[in-house]
Amino acid sequence: MSLLPVPYTEAASLSTGSTVTIKGRPLACFLNEPYLQVDFHTEMKEESDIVFHFQVCFGRRVVMNSREYGAWKQQVESKNMPFQDGQEFELSISVLPDKYQVMVNGQSSYTFDHRIKPEAVKMVQVWRDISLTKFNVSYLKR
């Protein structure tokens, strides 16, 4: 299986029913506190506002947030850690009418209420201390 480059950036437009699927593996053991970060940007540049920020400090915590007009908002933190040390993971972020639902290895693990409409997303970036084997955006068929 070939690896995708990290950081990985792709243009995307999201709406209710869209799902972003990411498959990868932490590059270091959890004792070294590797990170995974997924950002849904409003423009095709890293400095743009972030509709949804999802950051995992493997083995410790998950932080979710948004950045509006250049300022971070109130972060939501969870100690729920469904990721396994040294194991491949599949992360799916689904756009629901009022929130994002985050699944890890097929299990509902986190939710984050919309602060900025998902239709504002123009780019998804996946980065930090992971090897990345899959990135896909699927859309609800109408």
Curated annotation (Swiss-Prot):
Primary location: cytoplasm
Subunit and partners: Interacts with CEL.
Membrane-spanning ranges: none
UniProt entry keywords in alphabetical sequence: Acetylation, Cytoplasm, Lectin
Keyword Cytoplasm part of the UniProt annotation: yes
Physiological role: Regulates immune responses through the recognition of cell-surface glycans. Essential for the anergy and suppressive function of CD25-positive regulatory T-cells (Treg).
Modified residues (N-acetylserine): 2
InterPro entries membership: ConA-like_dom_sf, Galectin-like, Galectin_CRD
Organism of this sequence: Homo sapiens (Human)
One annotated GO molecular function: carbohydrate binding
Other information: Forms hexagonal bipyramidal crystals, known as Charcot-Leyden crystals, in tissues and secretions from sites of eosinophil-associated inflammation and some myeloid leukemias.
GO cellular component, one term: cytosol
Tagged with keyword rRNA-binding: no
Segments forming domain Galectin: 6-138
Site for Not glycosylated, residues: 136
Stated name of the protein: Galectin-10
Subcellular location: Cytoplasm, Cytosol; Cytoplasmic granule
